[in-house]
Amino acid sequence: MERVRGASSSDSVATLHGDHNYHCMATFKLDCTSARTRGVVSILEHRDPATVDDIFMQRVCHDINDVLRPVECLTSFPEYRRTLRVAVEAATELHGVSALSGQLTKFLEDHDGAMLPLAWPPNRYLRLTSGRKLGYLDVAEKLRKEYPMCNGPLEVLGVILGPGQSLYSDQHPVLLMGLTGTIFLHARGRPVWSPDYDPERDADRLFLAAESLQSFGREGLCRCDNVYTEDGGAPYATPEDPVLKNIVFTPHLGGKALHQQICKIKGHTWYLNGCPGMLKDRVFVATPDIPPFVRHVNLELFGHRFLPIGRVTRSPEDPECEMFIMVDAGGAIYGHMLDSGKVRRLADNFDQFMRMGTRRVISISRWLREVVSTPSTRRPRLGPRTTGSFS
């Protein structure tokens, strides 16, 4: 995997306190954009955040409803559109083979060297090979022991390569599949004896790439959340604290219960992950308070379907709100976009929201239009039938 040396720590501090320009990457970089990785990426292009956000919101979900990561933010979106169909077909075929007991390893060895295109990033391929041929069986076993969330043995699927790259370089990431079908990416670390070795950036890391091979086919590597060993893994942008643990570890946390907990911790803040390849961290401020006009719009359009639980800002010191965060009765998280007035589904629950931030944006403008033209006694359904409302 290509490694890009980053900016100084002073630049990172400057970014933390107000420099929120996007730093778009042309290189293949898999670090999540949390506070841990500010200043690490190559500064190849500067964009106004408002412009990029606007383009993202215009493009998202217009044609590809299932691809909900921030692929649309990236400069490679046209290439992604062209590659998507082939990538999905290849991943679907591989998924079919993996469902046959004991056949996956044989398939990988029979098709050793086959190159399957990734949906993202552009010009990257999964070069099929087995753990035995790659000499990776011991490494896979070591990862299984170090990362409890892997939950069983890991099967090597292949190596991520670009055009003309050699299989035998130890810098290329290795794709693995867990026992339950979860896809992981192992970024092999640089040798510790390298002159400029940095343990924070150059140690080997494990990423959660996708929940399944089907998701991997649609998304490629645009997710790649960090995986940690503590408590079986927690890819949050902010360190876990007792308040966060108390919320996310509460079983069957519904919307009303979450709203009540938010009321108790009013003003608490956490960092949220931004888009892969961009310095776009955001801060979630837990608060049940929203301006009267926002409350009025929500009541007018949705009745008592949502309860406010907070807002998203650019930094802890920045009072300007980018998005108000709401929860429905089933615990799903929604964002009210102030610039467009749209309400978009962000996550299935609060834990997922804390992991994904505002990266996963599902447009519900279709239902929004239906609400406007539908009598208040027949409001359209915005989620699972079990969601209900707070009335």
UniProtKB/Swiss-Prot annotation:
The keyword Protein biosynthesis does not apply. InterPro entries: US22-like. Keywords: Early protein, G0/G1 host cell cycle checkpoint dysregulation by virus, Host cytoplasm, Host nucleus, Host-virus interaction, Modulation of host cell cycle by virus. GO terms for biological process: symbiont-mediated perturbation of host cell cycle G0/G1 transition checkpoint; symbiont-mediated perturbation of host cell cycle progression. One of its GO terms (cellular component) is host cell nucleus. Its main location: host cell. Coiled coil: none annotated. It is found in: Host cytoplasm; Host nucleus. The keyword Hydrolase does not apply. Belongs to the herpesviridae US22 family. Involved in the reactivation of latent MCMV in spleen cells. This is Immediate-early protein 2. It comes from Murid herpesvirus 1 (strain Smith). The lineage of its organism: Viruses, Duplodnaviria, Heunggongvirae, Peploviricota, Herviviricetes. The gene is IE2.
